[in-house]
Amino acid sequence: MFLYVIAYDIPDDRRRKKMADLLEGYGQRVQYSVFECTLSKSKFNELQKRLRKIYQSEEDSLRFYPLSGHTLTQVDIWGEPPLTKPPGSVIV
């Protein structure tokens, strides 16, 4: 399992809503266009496949950032919500 930060910039309101609705089924919205999703490799691949059906390469931008255990210890958060913790992880 990895914690993925997924960020997007989609100018079309309808596509942006579809993207957000899909991502809400996989993780937690932490900012307007940013989600944290704890996913297995197979779930991540499934999500990407579903996102590709919405994504328009000539207009949209999608970014996927996998966070390692070491990286998670370096995260600094100001405000809410708190960092999504992968199952079985300990953040020091």
From Swiss-Prot:
Alphabetic keyword roster: Antiviral defense, Endonuclease, Hydrolase, Magnesium, Metal-binding, Nuclease, Plasmid
- Taxonomy, superkingdom: Bacteria
Question: So which cofactors does this thing need?
Answer: Mg(2+)
Which species is listed as the source? Synechocystis sp. (strain ATCC 27184 / PCC 6803 / Kazusa)
Task: Tell me the GO molecular function terms.
Answer: metal ion binding; RNA endonuclease activity
Name of the protein in its database record: CRISPR-associated endoribonuclease Cas2 3
Q: What does this protein do?
A: CRISPR (clustered regularly interspaced short palindromic repeat), is an adaptive immune system that provides protection against mobile genetic elements (viruses, transposable elements and conjugative plasmids). CRISPR clusters contain sequences complementary to antecedent mobile elements and target invading nucleic acids. CRISPR clusters are transcribed and processed into CRISPR RNA (crRNA). Functions as a ssRNA-specific endoribonuclease. Involved in the integration of spacer DNA into the CRISPR cassette.
Record-linked InterPro entries: CRISPR_associated_Cas2, Virulence_VapD/CRISPR_Cas2
Gene3D superfamilies documented for this protein: 3.30.70.240
Q: How does it assemble?
A: Homodimer, forms a heterotetramer with a Cas1 homodimer.
Cite a single Pfam family from the UniProt record: CRISPR_Cas2
Q: What class of enzyme is it?
A: hydrolase
Name the residues that bind Mg(2+): D9
Q: Which residues form a coiled coil?
A: none
EC number, as in UniProt: 3.1.-.-
The record's similarity note reads: Belongs to the CRISPR-associated endoribonuclease Cas2 protein family.
PANTHER family assigned:
CRISPR-ASSOCIATED ENDORIBONUCLEASE CAS2, CRISPR-ASSOCIATED ENDORIBONUCLEASE CAS2 3
Annotated membrane-spanning segments are: none
UniProt-listed GO biological process terms:
defense response to virus; maintenance of CRISPR repeat elements
